[in-house]
């Protein structure tokens, strides 16, 4: 049975535009390009994307057996899978590494190492499971134009050298394979990013070996350009977060997003840096890690986790894969704590 557009919580203006122009069911929306919907209905691209993300996310569940379930043991097995960060200390702080089926956010100022960590994770996802990898592939969504293939080659080269030393008989590990297994998609504006996220379920079905999705960064196209229409921005971000969380859970993959920092004024002559995109976005992420500078040293703080205590780690970025991100563990109160 086709689900009617009337059954969704849409503004009267959007609902009228859709129905009066022949878009009466989910299928009418899901199988048409955003540009065509805008041309037919007169909706702005942002409005059409908002509708598309909501109806396709719900429609993906249609036809499934609502009584299907997993046992507690199966869920425990799924949630016990982690992707190594290549640093034993950071993995320990996180409880094993980057968890699957969760939305993980890495925040920090420019130059602190967010992109470096993103690329490292893309390579790590291809490592055999006995070395903390996922035996899979990765998708990197680049919004800032900061992807440089030479940096990925350097990390892949270190990974290959590391694996060859650990197990000379290991197969299917080559530079060509490492690069082919990282699917890169560049998004030039936020509407393109939203469209890519909307189409991710289909892409994952076609590329079933993908075990990691990285968005670097989630905030780049959302910091400006909304003309103070922050309610629209919040709706789009929340819809995007819900889609990513759903993907992580249904496809048993790791989802990592990077975020920038912004200045918060807390007094006449006092301010400090906080993650961009506001509190609503922060509540959507399962885990939040903040990278920052202090006394010319890099620090990382695990600020939010449902099962781990807050911890601060001093780190430096080095060359070798088995020490690509060298962390020194310390426990103290975070400067970002409430």
What is each PLM-predicted segment?
Residues 133-230:
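Conserved inter-motif catalytic segment of the P-loop NTP-binding fold
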Residues 17, 36, 40, 51-167, ...:
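The Walker A/P-loop phosphate-binding site
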Residues 104, 139-141, 183-185, 256, ...:
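Hydrophobic/aromatic beta-strand patches that form the interior of the parallel beta-sheet core
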Residues 13, 46, 85, 101, ...:
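Charged, alpha-helix-enriched surfaces in structured cytosolic catalytic cores
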Residues 1-66:
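Compact, charge-rich alpha-helical regulatory domains located at protein termini
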Residues 234-238, 242-338:
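Phosphate-binding/switch region of NTP-binding enzymes
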Residues 110, 187-280:
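P-loop NTPase motor core
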Residues 54, 58, 93-97, 109, ...:
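Conserved, well-folded catalytic cores of nucleic-acid-processing
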């Amino acid at each position: 049975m086709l689900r009617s557009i009337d059954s969704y919580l849409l503004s009267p203006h959007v609902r009228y535009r859709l129905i009066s122009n022949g878009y009466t069911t989910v299928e009418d929306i899901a199988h048409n390009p955003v540009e065509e919907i805008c041309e037919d209905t007169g909706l702005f691209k942002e409005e059409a994307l908002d509708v598309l993300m909501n109806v396709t996310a719900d429609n993906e569940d249609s036809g499934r057996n609502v009584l299907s379930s997993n046992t507690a043991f199966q869920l425990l097995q799924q949630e016990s899978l982690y992707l190594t960060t290549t640093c034993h200390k950071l993995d320990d702080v996180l409880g094993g590494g980057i968890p699957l089926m969760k939305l993980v956010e890495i925040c920090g100022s420019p130059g602190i190492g967010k992109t470096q960590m993103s690329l490292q994770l893309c390579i790590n996802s291809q490592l055999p499971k006995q070395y903390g990898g996922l035996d899979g592939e990765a998708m990197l969504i680049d919004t800032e134009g900061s992807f440089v293939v030479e940096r990925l080659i350097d990390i892949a080269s270190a990974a290959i050298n590391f694996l060859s030393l650990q197990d000379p008989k290991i197969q299917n590990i080559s530079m060509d394979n490492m690069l082919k297994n990282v699917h890169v998609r560049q998004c030039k504006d936020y509407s393109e990013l939203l469209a890519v996220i909307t189409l991710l379920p289909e892409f994952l079905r076609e590329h079933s070996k993908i075990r990691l999705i990285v968005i670097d960064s989630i905030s780049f196209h959302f910091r400006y350009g909304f003309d103070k229409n922050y309610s629209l921005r919040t709706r789009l971000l929340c819809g995007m977060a819900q889609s990513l969380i759903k993907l992580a859970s249904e496809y048993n993959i790791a989802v990592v997003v990077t975020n920038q920092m912004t200045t918060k004024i807390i007094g006449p002559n006092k301010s400090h840096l906080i993650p961009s995109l506001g509190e609503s976005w922060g509540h959507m992420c399962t885990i939040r890690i903040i990278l920052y500078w202090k006394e010319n040293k890099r620090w990382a703080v695990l600020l939010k986790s449902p099962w781990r205590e807050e911890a601060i780690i001093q780190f430096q970025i080095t060359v070798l894969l088995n020490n690509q991100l060298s962390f020194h563990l310390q426990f103290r109160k975070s400067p970002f704590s409430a």
